[in-house]
């Protein structure tokens, strides 16, 4: 049942990535003995700005649906995707600093993706 008050899946995913980023960030700070309130506040501000950015996207979608603006695109989904990608990169960076062995496991895959983007032939 889809309610007016239901949270769209893209928002749930963006929020989940934000939570995982906070958790891995705290783990990294504890491991490196760098836990401090200033950095935590900056992280909270960043997450709050992402949430406001997502809300802005839904407001823009609403405006495009009800006011003829001459253009239409899925602003909220685009913004959620941007947030998810940004948070995923941050999570991977945090995990790499928490456990450097993970970098060794993921590096060949990332290198192959990079080569594929550059149009190089990848041997299997």
Q: Where do the language-model regions lie?
A:
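Juxtamembrane helix-capping/reentrant segments at transmembrane boundaries
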Residues: 35-50
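Membrane interface segments of multi-pass transport proteins and intramembrane proteases
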Residues: 34-38, 65-72, 97-104
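Short, strongly hydrophobic alpha-helical membrane anchors
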Residues: 1-8
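Membrane-proximal cytosolic segments adjacent to transmembrane helices
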Residues: 85-124
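Hydrophobic alpha-helical transmembrane segments
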Residues: 70-80
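Membrane-helix exit/interface motif
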Residues: 27-31, 55-68
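Alpha-helical transmembrane segments of multi-pass membrane proteins
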Residues: 14-24, 50-61, 79-90
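Membrane-interface helix-loop junction between the first two transmembrane segments
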Residues: 13, 22-39
């Amino acid at each position: 049942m889809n309610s007016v008050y239901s949270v769209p899946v893209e928002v749930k995913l963006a929020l989940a990535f934000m939570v995982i980023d906070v958790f891995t960030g705290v783990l990294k700070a504890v491991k490196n003995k760098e836990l401090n309130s200033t950095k935590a506040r900056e992280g909270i501000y960043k997450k709050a700005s992402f949430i406001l950015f997502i809300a802005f996207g839904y407001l823009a979608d609403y405006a495009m649906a009800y006011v003829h603006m001459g253009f239409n695109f899925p602003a909220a989904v685009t913004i959620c995707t941007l947030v998810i990608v940004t948070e995923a990169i941050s999570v991977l960076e945090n995990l790499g600093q928490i456990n450097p062995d993970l970098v060794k496991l993921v590096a060949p895959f990332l290198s192959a993706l990079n080569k594929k983007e550059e149009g190089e032939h990848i041997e299997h």
